[in-house]
């Protein structure tokens, strides 16, 4: 018995030290967090919600690149889809195009070192970000650059939720169809995507891009602004967005693990007469995230919020839609990791026609979703409850 008590004390102390490391690391990191909110711009913006279409469009644009290809992804892997992209990047680098590829340490661990080295040998500037380091080792282990940005010749930009791997094209039976939203942008906003890429490159490598990668760009037709977050400002931005809602709002997220203020903001919006819809996946791609989400649903259902669970594949969309004019689409999930740890980027689009297109896409998603009722919620087995509360307890790190 004494041995067991000693072991438990050691375990408690160990986890307490980990938490102390993470929270002290986060407090210290705040001074160098990069969270720009760019001024309003006008661009031509296209919504893409099919992974195969996205990769085809992106690769076609890269094939036409004349001067530069700047790509930043959270996840790329050791599969055919990823290797097709690696081959194209190598081809462009060998043709004299300046090619940079930024990858997150946690997200790119499936890539073989030989693949990275082969790209480097071909002239691709490959850099891995957010490697764990001291001090605050455990904090840095939790940091993720979750941004997905591609800028081609400084004129064409891509940003959104898709990564580059087979499952994002619906080629993994485990997930089936993969629903996500990505944006293709031409116009002034590409300048801001390039600035964000250049900043992440400099902060992680010390390398500065030349001024020639910011060509003069023409205005497009859709008003928008781009903002990046680094674990500190996203919660307040979302709270301000939700407070604007007068008639309806829709949250699309693969992981519904909000902060307490955001949960309360949605409930208050519903109490004030705003229609609140939340779309989440039926299945899960990570342990405990679905279980953690269930601990928030009772309050939402009691308030009259509608929760739809997408069942025709996996739902990875990151979007917040306010009334009939505001669409926020990007890389940030509606969870604590995106709110308080990750480096993210969103595009806030103020345009009725574009928002109408987004709503039409969401309506199609809802046809492939099941409405969660309080009766269904109450039928959860008691065996599920411990996993739910374990997920809730660990929600900051899921």
Swiss-Prot record:
Classification via SUPFAM superfamilies: Phospholipase D/nuclease (SSF56024)
Phenotype upon loss of function: Cells lacking this gene show a lack of cardiolipin.
Keywords: Cell membrane, Membrane, Repeat, Transferase, Transmembrane, Transmembrane helix
Family assignment from sequence similarity: Belongs to the phospholipase D family. Cardiolipin synthase subfamily.
Family matches, as PANTHER family: CARDIOLIPIN SYNTHASE (PTHR21248), MINOR CARDIOLIPIN SYNTHASE CLSB (PTHR21248:SF7)
Localization per record: Cell membrane
Boundaries of every PLD phosphodiesterase domain copy: 141-168, 311-338
Transmembrane region(s): 3-23
Name this protein carries in UniProt: Minor cardiolipin synthase ClsB
Native organism: Bacillus subtilis (strain 168)
InterPro entries: Cardiolipin_synthase (IPR022924), PLD-like_dom (IPR025202), PLipase_D/transphosphatidylase (IPR001736)
Keyword Transmembrane: yes
Biological process annotations from GO: cardiolipin biosynthetic process; sporulation
Free-text function comment from the UniProt entry: Involved in the biosynthesis of cardiolipin.
GO molecular function: cardiolipin synthase activity
Topology class, membrane: Single-pass membrane protein
Record carries keyword Hydrolase: no
Pfam families associated with the record: PLDc_2
């Amino acid at each position: 018995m004494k041995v067991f008590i000693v072991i438990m004390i050691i375990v408690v102390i160990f986890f307490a030290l980990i938490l102390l490391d993470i929270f002290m690391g986060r407090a210290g990191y705040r001074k160098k967090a990069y969270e720009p909110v760019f001024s309003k711009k006008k661009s031509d913006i296209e919504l893409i919600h099919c992974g195969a279409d996205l990769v085809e469009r992106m690769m076609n644009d890269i094939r036409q690149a004349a001067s530069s290809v700047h790509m930043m992804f959270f996840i790329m892997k050791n599969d055919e889809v990823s290797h097709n992209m690696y081959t194209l990047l190598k081809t462009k680098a060998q043709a004299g195009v300046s090619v940079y590829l930024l990858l997150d340490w946690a997200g790119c661990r499936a890539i073989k070192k030989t693949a990275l080295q082969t790209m480097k040998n071909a002239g691709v500037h490959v850099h891995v970000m957010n490697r764990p380091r001291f001090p605050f080792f455990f904090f840095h282990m939790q940091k993720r650059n979750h941004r997905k940005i591609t800028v081609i010749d400084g004129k064409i930009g891509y940003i959104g939720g898709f990564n580059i791997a087979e499952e994002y094209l619906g080629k993994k039976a485990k997930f089936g169809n993969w629903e996500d939203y990505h944006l293709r942008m031409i116009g002034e906003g590409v300048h801001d995507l390039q600035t964000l890429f250049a900043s992440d490159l400099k902060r992680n490598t010390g390398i500065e891009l030349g001024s020639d990668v910011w060509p003069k760009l023409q205005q497009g037709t859709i008003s928008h602004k781009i903002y990046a977050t680094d674990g500190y400002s996203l919660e307040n931005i979302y709270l301000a967005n939700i407070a604007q809602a007068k008639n309806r709002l829709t949250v699309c997220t693969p992981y519904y693990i909000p902060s307490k203020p955001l949960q309360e903001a949605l409930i208050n919006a519903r109490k004030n007469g705003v229609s609140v819809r939340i779309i989440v996946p039926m299945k899960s791609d990570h342990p405990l995230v679905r279980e953690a989400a269930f601990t928030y649903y009772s309050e939402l259902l009691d308030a009259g919020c509608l929760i739809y669970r997408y069942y025709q594949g996996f739902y990875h969309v990151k979007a917040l839609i306010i009334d009939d004019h505001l669409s926020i689409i990007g890389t940030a999930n509606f969870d604590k990791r995106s709110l308080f740890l990750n480096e993210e980027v969103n595009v806030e689009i103020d345009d009725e026609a574009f928002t109408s297109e987004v709503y039409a896409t969401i309506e199609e998603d809802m046809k492939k979703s099941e409405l969660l009722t309080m009766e269904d919620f109450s039928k959860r087995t008691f065996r599920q409850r411990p996993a739910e509360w374990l997920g809730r307890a660990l929600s900051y790190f899921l």
